[in-house]
């Protein structure tokens, strides 16, 4: 079963946390020519809630190194914080389910800003022969990969066996497709959650009230597992 996130932005004014309704968050699905409601507006009042297990792990240690059905997806991240629960002074909203699920947490903009986003992480997954040769062996990120792979014509090889196959030193069956699981070249946490880092955090910075600080803006979120 997959995991999704529900998230709101809040601003503290005069000591009270309020739900932010300002449209400051860029819409990743925006399409000027679209007639779909979710794609028509360039900016939204809620942070993007797209599924990104790397981000979930960074925010709260959720799905840390695990993908769909628990398959390994990479090294474990060092989360900003483990799940804190919902804040007692959370604003009223119709986005979050609350304690009914119990997977809530929150982070201030200061916590997000002071986190080390330049830490390195390596993703892990199954790649086919062409991808391994063209990307992995050159120290580059693959253009596609899977948490696992199976099928009638699929053969899983170890990495040394894949190298031998590419070098024509492993017996090949032309009716089969060959895959291997491996770690990829390191990338930064920032790159693992680039939309959140580049766009969502920029939107949060725009919410800092006059005379306020990064402590006066936060996200409250929950995971729907």
PLM feature segments, named:
Residues 1-213, 224-225:
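Acidic (Asp/Glu-rich) sequence patches and key acidic residues
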Residues 214-220:
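Short A/G/S/P-biased low-complexity tracts
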């Amino acid at each position: 079963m997959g995991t999704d996130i529900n998230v709101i932005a809040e601003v503290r004014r005069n000591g009270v946390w309020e739900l932010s309704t300002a449209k400051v968050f860029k819409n990743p699905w925006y399409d000027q020519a679209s007639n779909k409601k979710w794609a028509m507006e360039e900016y939204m009042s809620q942070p993007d809630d797209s599924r990104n297990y790397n981000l979930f792990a960074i925010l709260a240690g959720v799905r840390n190194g695990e993908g769909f059905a628990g398959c390994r997806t990479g090294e474990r991240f060092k989360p900003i914080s483990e799940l804190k629960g919902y804040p007692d002074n959370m604003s009223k909203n119709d986005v979050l389910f609350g304690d009914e699920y119990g997977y809530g947490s929150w982070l201030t903009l200061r916590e997000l800003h002071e986190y080390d986003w330049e830490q390195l992480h390596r993703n892990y997954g199954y790649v086919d022969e062409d991808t391994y040769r063209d990307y992995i062996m050159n120290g580059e990120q693959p253009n596609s990969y899977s948490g696992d792979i199976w099928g009638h014509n699929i053969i899983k090889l170890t990495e040394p066996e894949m190298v031998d196959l590419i070098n024509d030193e492993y017996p090949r069956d032309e009716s089969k497709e060959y895959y291997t699981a491996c770690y990829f070249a390191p990338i930064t946490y920032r790159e693992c959650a680039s939309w959140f880092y580049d766009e969502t955090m920029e939107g949060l910075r725009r919410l800092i009230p006059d005379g306020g600080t990064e402590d006066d803006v936060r996200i409250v979120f929950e995971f729907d597992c």
